[in-house]
Amino acid sequence: MSDLSEALNEYTAMRQNLGFVFRLPASLLRTFVAFVDQSGSPFITTELARQWALQPTEAQPSTWAWRLSIARRFAVWRRASDPRTEVPPADLVGQRYRRKPPRLYTDQDVVRLIQSAAALPSAKKLRGHTYATLFGLLAVTGLRINEALHLDRSDVDLQEGVLTIRRTKFGKSRLVPIHPTTQDALQAYGEARDRIIPKPATQAFFMSERRTRITEWITRYTFAVVSRMVGLRPPTRGGRHGHGPRIQDLRHRFAAQTLITWYRAGVDVERELPKLSTYLGHVHTADTYWYLEAIPELLQLAAERLAQTPPEVTP
């Protein structure tokens, strides 16, 4: 094992101990370290980081920038123990990685998505039930996609109206209360699921017709299919489902709609924001503040609220 590989193991352990789910970055960094090792260089160089970041060549520039950002953070950490390490400039591949602005689905968009998902064909008629209920749950709770997919039956308390979210992005569990109408929808899905699949092979709440837990990949694919069906994604050649609104935008919609409702109702958003952060599973309130900058309507409402606030008077 090379010195750089050992350093990566230490770096990965450090990030995980800080509470980060680091599987994908760690996997990418292993390919980066292998790339550096194969070049014969004993340390990270700017040119090697650039060459690695620009793979695959047909990827979007934002993907290259994201790959570079992962390598760059590792290089910053590595430089403390190996001064030979070169830290590549953040804009080395033409642009910095930035979070994509969210697409705020309208209520009509969500209804069309759910209705089209419910009509998805399948042999046992469970597929439509599963994805219509899943997409609806994401829209009204703001759960991350993996949080919903990792729900077991025991995590869904339909008597109390509470979901127990165990496998979160940062490894912390939390309780998510749900509306009575959401309870009813989950109850109806559970009854349909158990009728169609009386002997499941898993305790997963959301289940495939193969009696197994549905995967993130197939869920994202199905969402893309349904988005094209309702016109939210443009048609493309070769049967691909193109670019457009993403499934995580359902989470963004929930957060944004909550904040917009608070502003319009005159709620003290500064005081209530930590509650929304906890509900969403954000570790830092700053992650929730991001919506104020990313969504023009929220930025305008915040500016209007600030303009209405009387200035402080110092004695």
Question: Whereabouts are the PLM-identified features?
Answer:
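Conserved catalytic core of the tyrosine transesterase superfamily
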Residues: 1-315
